[in-house]
């Protein structure tokens, strides 16, 4: 274990400058099998401070160099992130194509992609650095970070509508950052969010509503699969078949509720509530770092699984969302507004607004924090972050956040796990 080796070495260390290498194996459960990769942790102590790097590459020592010079040589030669456990770590983005548009990942670790910490041209996978950083300042080794991503649907109706799905354990929160005016000329977009109260009331019981809705979904799924099969065979569906698909889809969707949203709105998605972001609505999303879901319906061919989960989902789904809590305003210095906009059992999110030139000392935290800029420019530890750029703030960091003089105001989101 690299951290245990580092702890024993550091306790016994009597030199002002020293270098420790630890070869270890890291499990990679995100690949779906209990595979392991061989890595080397590099710890460099100089003047009572430590720098950390990790690599899967062979390291060749130059005996003419001092420990610190050797460390910096390896970092440069192999393009490794040089991590100070007390300093913020920039998050790289990774774009994933979806049937409905694209996702932009910041902290995901899964088979489809592993996100990185970055510094200049250097990049290190998040779980690698978590495994070697002392004090769990970037989260516990082996534990995923709160999931941060952008959802960017196509502006085209139907094509850009996401899966109507629910989660049994995962909670999600969206902050709307843009409404495509091509899709929504008045600047008001939508998310499919639960079910129509009038439709529910028109049924003799909630159970009767569930069955009626399931019948509509089943009829649509049958027609959807027919069209998908014809397309896969290189055949063109007839106009009558396409018209039937549209009629069945509109009937199925008539049972659901459409919630209007505009820029800056916050949408909290509790467990078991079916939801589907609609075309042309761009959001920043924080969510529980798990990947389970049940697909209730989708107006395209589902590529990630060979079935819908409608039958099972309809039994347990919430029909209507719980009451929306109001944002909690937290004490803050002049020129700064802090709102707690999400308070889930597993994570919370604050929205912070700072006037031009304002400075804020947030203080240390018991956990890491994820920060993503909404608008304006933020200077943090000497690095400037613009809109949709993100950084992990380690738990013990106590530096200053500065709003740029160049923009009228700064707004960013700050998330932390509740643990």
Which residues make up each language-model segment?
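Active-site region of the double-stranded beta-helix
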Residues: 1-263, 278-375, 414
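Residue-level marker of beta-strand positions
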Residues: 19-21, 266, 272-274, 282, ...
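Fold-independent oxyanion-binding glycine-rich loops
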Residues: 179, 270-272, 286, 395-396, ...
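Short, glycine-/Ser/Thr-/acidic-enriched flexible segments
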Residues: 181, 274, 291, 377-378, ...
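Short acidic-glycine-tyrosine-enriched beta hairpin
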Residues: 256-268, 379-402
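Short beta-strand His + acidic residue motifs that chelate non-heme Fe in jelly-roll/DSBH
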Residues: 274-279, 284-287, 360-362, 380-381, ...
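Active-site pocket scaffolds in enzymes
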Residues: 371-372, 389-396, 413-416
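Compact beta-rich and alpha/beta scaffold cores in large eukaryotic transport/transcription complexes
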Residues: 386, 406-410
């Amino acid at each position: 274990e690299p951290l245990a080796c580092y702890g024993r070495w550091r306790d016994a260390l009597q030199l002002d400058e020293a270098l420790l290498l630890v070869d270890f194996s890291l499990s990679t459960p995100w690949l779906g099998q209990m595979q392991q990769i061989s890595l080397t942790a590099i710890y460099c102590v100089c003047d009572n401070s430590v720098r950390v790097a990790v690599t899967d590459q062979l390291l060749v020592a130059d005996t003419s160099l001092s420990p610190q010079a050797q460390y910096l040589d390896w970092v440069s030669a192999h393009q490794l992130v040089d991590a100070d456990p007390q300093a913020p770590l920039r998050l790289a983005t990774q774009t994933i194509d979806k049937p409905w548009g694209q996702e932009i990942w910041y902290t995901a670790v899964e088979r489809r992609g592993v996100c990185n910490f970055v510094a200049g041209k250097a990049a290190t996978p998040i779980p690698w650095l978590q495994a070697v950083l002392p004090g769990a300042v970037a989260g516990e080794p082996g534990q995923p970070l709160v999931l941060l991503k952008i959802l960017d649907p196509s502006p085209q109706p139907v094509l850009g509508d996401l899966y109507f799905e629910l989660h049994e354990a995962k909670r999600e929160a969206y902050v709307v950052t843009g409404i495509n005016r091509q899709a929504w000329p008045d600047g008001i977009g939508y998310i499919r969010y639960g079910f129509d109260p009038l439709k529910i009331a028109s049924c003799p019981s909630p159970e009767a509503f569930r069955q009626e809705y399931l019948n509509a979904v089943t009829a649509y799924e049958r027609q959807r699969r027919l069209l998908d099969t014809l397309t896969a065979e290189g055949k063109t569906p007839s106009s009558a078949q396409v018209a039937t698909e549209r009629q069945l889809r509109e009937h199925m969707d008539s049972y659901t509720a459409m919630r209007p949203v505009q820029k800056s709105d916050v949408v909290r998605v509790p467990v078991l509530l079916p939801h589907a972001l609609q075309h042309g609505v761009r959001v920043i999303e924080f969510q529980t770092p798990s990947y389970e879901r049940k697909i209730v319906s989708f107006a395209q061919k589902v590529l990630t699984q060979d079935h819908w989960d409608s039958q099972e989902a309809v039994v347990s789904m919430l029909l209507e969302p719980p009451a929306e809590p109001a944002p909690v305003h937290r004490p803050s210095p002049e020129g700064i507004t802090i709102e707690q906009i999400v308070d889930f059992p597993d994570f919370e999110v604050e929205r912070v607004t700072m006037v031009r030139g304002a400075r804020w000392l947030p203080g240390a935290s018991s956990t890491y924090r994820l920060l993503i800029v909404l608008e304006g420019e933020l200077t943090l530890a000497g690095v400037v972050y613009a809109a949709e750029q993100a950084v992990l703030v380690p738990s013990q960091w106590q530096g200053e956040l500065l709003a740029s003089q160049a923009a009228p105001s700064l707004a960013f989101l700050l998330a932390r796990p509740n643990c």
